[in-house]
């Protein structure tokens, strides 16, 4: 009965052959034996080659340099505006201002600062005159019997250096001493100094006070040389200074 059962895989009349050929692992002589292409190029090498190609392009390099310069320029501008905001009054520093708002607030604040500087300079002049007048009056009272002592302190001059090219000069003299203040101004201007401003006042102690804001055109102000020059100008008018 078993012999009548047909095989599971019929050969349809073809010989089955040797099955040992398919059971072996040696397929070196088959049609599958062909060389594979070399695909070992890495991503890094490709990227490096692309970057080298871009850097060799003058248009790309110009664009990269422009972008770098623009970033640096914006960084400097932001730093300058940040410094400008820090100079504004505290009420304007509570919130971050835009560029246009910062410039607007600065333009409004500059005249206020200029007015404050004028008031402070005026106050300084008044204090300097008061101190100089008190010192001279005390010396005059103590030496009222000595005419030479009174004469030697009849007039005084002092200078305050404001900057490398500017100086404030204060002159104190007795009203009884006759000297032309215009002669002093003329002599100073002949020496290359520019008169920025001048003022005068009178105290209760019979003294006159003059203030001159001078600026030199070329070079720096030398306080000692300026004092000697004023001393010479006043000596021409019959004054002596200490």
Swiss-Prot record:
<dbReference type="Pfam" id="PF00010">
    <property type="entry name" value="HLH"/>
</dbReference>
<keyword id="KW-0804">Transcription</keyword>
<dbReference type="GO" id="GO:0005634">
    <property type="term" value="C:nucleus"/>
</dbReference>
<comment type="subunit">
    <text>Homodimer.</text>
</comment>
<dbReference type="GO" id="GO:0009414">
    <property type="term" value="P:response to water deprivation"/>
</dbReference>
<feature type="domain" description="bHLH">
    <location>
        <begin position="61"/>
        <end position="113"/>
    </location>
</feature>
<dbReference type="GO" id="GO:0006357">
    <property type="term" value="P:regulation of transcription by RNA polymerase II"/>
</dbReference>
<comment type="function">
    <text>Plays a role in metal homeostasis. Confers tolerance to high zinc (Zn) and nickel (Ni).</text>
</comment>
<dbReference type="GO" id="GO:0003677">
    <property type="term" value="F:DNA binding"/>
</dbReference>
<keyword id="KW-0805">Transcription regulation</keyword>
<dbReference type="InterPro" id="IPR036638">
    <property type="entry name" value="HLH_DNA-bd_sf"/>
</dbReference>
<dbReference type="GO" id="GO:0006355">
    <property type="term" value="P:regulation of DNA-templated transcription"/>
</dbReference>
<keyword id="KW-0539">Nucleus</keyword>
<dbReference type="GO" id="GO:0046983">
    <property type="term" value="F:protein dimerization activity"/>
</dbReference>
<dbReference type="InterPro" id="IPR011598">
    <property type="entry name" value="bHLH_dom"/>
</dbReference>
<dbReference type="GO" id="GO:0010106">
    <property type="term" value="P:cellular response to iron ion starvation"/>
</dbReference>
<keyword id="KW-0238">DNA-binding</keyword>
<dbReference type="GO" id="GO:0003700">
    <property type="term" value="F:DNA-binding transcription factor activity"/>
</dbReference>
<protein>
    <recommendedName>
        <fullName>Transcription factor bHLH100</fullName>
    </recommendedName>
</protein>
<dbReference type="InterPro" id="IPR015660">
    <property type="entry name" value="MASH1/Ascl1a-like"/>
</dbReference>
